[in-house]
Amino acid sequence: MLIGISPVRISFAGGGTDLPEFYEKYEGSVVATTISQYTYVMIQERSDNAFQAFSPDFQKHYKATKFNKIEIEDGTEIASSVIKYLKYKKGINIVLCSDAPTGSGLGTSGALTVNLVNLIYNLQGLKNSKKNIAETAFKIGHDVLNWPIGKQDEYISSYGGLNFIKFKKNKIQVIPIKMEKNVTKELQNNLLLFFLGATRNSSTILSQQVKNIKEKNNKTIESLEQVNKLSKKMFRVLKKSNIDEFGDLLDEGWNAKKRFSEGVTNNKINKIYDLALQNGAVGGKLTGAGGGGHLLFYCKPTKKKNLIKKLTNIGLSHVPLKFTNQGPQVLNLYDTIGGSTK
């Protein structure tokens, strides 16, 4: 039995510019990090040719007697699509779950796909690069499942750590952001993450953004170009181990993101954001495509306690936040306990 662990992410700047429809014409970039919330995938080979997938998060179970009978159904679609795309025809059981719910703005679906792709490659004894794993996971989400997604979730989870990722047509470059350890710790300590208590379907919002890009909607294009510039500026600031401007850059990026398309924000989110600014937050953003999920704020240490109290009092959940450096990891359970797979 193999167990895979792959981290989810927080994008600080540039989200939306990772859509191929945008960056292949205009170029894009993101600043993002993996965090200590994970997706988990367990796979076990079977003695027959059956395929079986379980998703405790969605309370879904799917079984097919053999490879050519596998269909893609809601709740277990990631497992089915990965197996079909990679043409893994042996019998297998797959269980998928995560710390962060799908639709919470932390890139859970992309991280789950990266996780399972990496596991199947390991099961086949194939060594693959971080880039290839990310690209394969993206193709499964975009081409097989027809999700209107960008590439940041897959790349961030596959590479792990705090990175600046440049998106150009036919070229994607991942640049690790190396800061002094005390500055990285200070940045992490100054960030507060809150769960709004409701998830959302990002496909509707992203589909509208893709439509706007294809139609060359000036408001959308100009906003995306602005967040791309902010992402580059944030990268320049962070690589100098300077975080003084970080909160303001988050705020600028959020104000630009709200102009991407309808549905990115709503009155409830706007009121919470304004309340946070009134109680110590320098800046912040909604994680993911928008509409719900998590709110991230940059706050000076002396203001953190008050901000946490204010936002939890109105029903938000404070989520502990810790940066991580690793991408997907694989554990062979039988090797760990000294047993045998036979």
List each language-model region with its residue ranges.
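Short pre-catalytic strand/loop immediately N-terminal to key active-site residues, enriched for Gly-Thr
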Residues: S98-S104, V282
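C-terminal nucleotide
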Residues: M1-A13, T17-E24, V30-A32, Y40-Y88, ...
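Glycine-rich active-site/cofactor-binding loop and its immediate structural neighborhood
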Residues: G292-H294
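DPxDG-like acidic metal-binding loop motif
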Residues: L106-L126, K130
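Conserved catalytic cysteine-centered active-site region
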Residues: Y88-V95
